[in-house]
Structure formats: structure tokens, C-alpha cells
Amino acid sequence: MDGPMRPRSASLVDFQFGVVATETIEDALLHLAQQNEQAVREASGRLGRFREPQIVEFVFLLSEQWCLEKSVSYQAVEILERFMVKQAENICRQATIQPRDNKRESQNWRALKQQLVNKFTLRLVSCVQLASKLSFRNKIISNITVLNFLQALGYLHTKEELLESELDVLKSLNFRINLPTPLAYVETLLEVLGYNGCLVPAMRLHATCLTLLDLVYLLHEPIYESLLRASIENSTPSQLQGEKFTSVKEDFMLLAVGIIAASAFIQNHECWSQVVGHLQSITGIALASIAEFSYAILTHGVGANTPGRQQSIPPHLAARALKTVASSNT
């Protein structure tokens, strides 16, 4: 790399709440809500397949090494996810149009799959580099830095190959890489909570939200699996139920309220009911859904200290208990 870089928490530098006009916040929240509705409608069954913990951890550590904001790491994960889904779809499409020769078809499939595997690290780094270019507060990661990093891992690439990789990602996504991330929803909702008189300071919630959002990205599957089981009150969901649940995984507004509610419980559980009540009135998301999501996050993040776990209460009943508490105090 271009000399040693000391990791820092760029997301918290010069970050302030309460300095944006209420009209601007309202417009931003409305825009995010519209984007979220569209994303939920268009949710594909393949989304989420490339959010494996090892991949997410790689992106997070690389972003930290390059001193990038947390928003960049989330953006990079979303870009990589959508790009790899497109690549996988293209491979399947090419495999189906090949002549019906079983032996040749198998060879073509293996070749296409291997090509995808061989370029994966390059694609991942390209997604991080592209994400860094979307933030005004980050320095753009130079090609030399990227090439040196890849070389340290044993991958030898030229500047031309690096530029081609970025262009491949851009073309595959129709140059639409400024994708919304859960952090944008979290921070916008925190702004609204601040104006609504939330008892827990937004900055305190923000720091905890970043930690929990990392947790959700790293433990994406187990958290959403537990949420699915709680929502259907069944420990063994069917494949069809799992496929229908895909839209929930793409609901960033729901994720944001769950993150904030869980953060509020950690910061000051006595104010939890007030925070959840505000979130319900702002987003229209049911108290039960907020309670279930916050419980799923807390049980994976805090474990035994979570309400319900201490008394060995089933998850869906514990979530109902949280919902009841919120209803009675708002």
C-alpha cells in the first residue's frame, strides 16, 4: 500500500444531528420510504446469497484498513451483492443457451463458474473502490493502493485490468451504484427522533447503531432465520415461506427501526418504549414487527442479558411481551 494507514472511525468524525432543516429531513425520509417500497417489491429470491460472513468481514476490514467511513463498507457490500447476483444470472443464462450436449454443457458450466471464482477478489476490491468514490468525505482509493493490496494477496493485475473490472461492475448495474444502505435509513430516523424529543441522545444511539448494524451484516442469515421463525411461530419454516420472506430481508426501513430499537434498549431500557412508540408513529411499522426485530438483534448481539432469554421464553412470546410493554407505555 501507499505507506501505513491507521484505521479510524471515520463515520463519527464531524458527525452532528439537529443541524438540518425539518423540511429537508421530511423530504429525505419520504424519498427513502419510496425507495424502500420499490426495493421490497422488486426483491429477488437470489438476493442475499453473496452476503456471507467471510465476504462481509473482508469488506469491513478492508474499508477499515483504508480508513473509509462505515457508510462506504455498507455501500460496497450492497454493490458487490447486486453485481454478483447479475453475474450468477448471466452464467445460468449462458448455460441454458448452450447446445444440449451433457458433457459439453458440464464443461462450459464449470468454466464459467471458475471464471467467476478467479475474479471474485478483484471484483470485491473494485466494489470497495467504487463505493469510496461515492462519498465526498472520503479520499478516493488510488489504483496503486489497490494493486499493491492485491499483489500482497498473491494476485497480479495491471491498471488496465483494474479499470476494466470497475467498468464491468458499472455496466452490469447500468451505472446505478449509488445504492441506498440501511445506515441512511438509521441516520434519517435518528434525525426525526431528535426533533420529536427522544429521551436518548441521537449521538449515543448512533454509535450503538453502527455496532449493531455491523452485527446484522455479519450475522445476516441467523438473525433473519430467527426472525422468520418468530414471525410464523414455527421452528421449521417451509421453502415457500423462506422465499416469501426475501422481501423482508430487503426492507431497510424495517431493519433501521429494529436497529434503533435494539440500540435504545442497550443505552437506556427505561426509554425503550418511548423510542419504539416514536418509530411506530414515524414509519407506520407495527409495534410487533419492531419488537420482534429488536429481539432478534439483541439475542444474537447480547444473548443472555436479553429480556425473555433469562426466563427461557420462546422468541415469539418474548417479542409479544416487548410489544405489550411498548403498547402500554406509549
From Swiss-Prot:
Job description of the protein: Plays a role in the different steps of crossover formation during meiotic recombination. Participates in the crossover differentiation step of crossover-specific recombination intermediates through its interaction with PRR19. In addition, stimulates crossover formation through the interactions with RFC3 and RFC4 and simultaneously regulates cell-cycle progression through interactions with CDC34 and subsequent ubiquitination of WEE1. May also participates in an active deselection process that destabilizes or removes excess pre-CO intermediates.
Cyclin N-terminal domain segment(s): 27-178
Main location: nucleus
Localisation per UniProt entry: Nucleus; Cytoplasm; Chromosome
InterPro entries xrefs: Cyclin-like_sf, Cyclin_N
Biological processes annotated in GO: reciprocal meiotic recombination; regulation of meiotic cell cycle; spermatogenesis
GO-annotated cellular components: chromosome; cytoplasm; nucleus; site of double-strand break
Family matches, as Pfam families: Cyclin_N
UniProt keyword Nucleus, yes or no: yes
CDD domains tied to this protein: CYCLIN_CNTD1
Gene name per UniProt: CNTD1
Name of the featured protein: Cyclin N-terminal domain-containing protein 1
Subunit structure: Interacts with PRR19; this interaction promotes crossover formation. Interacts with RFC3 and RFC4; these interactions facilitate crossover formation. Interacts with CDC34; this interaction regulates the cell-cycle progression.
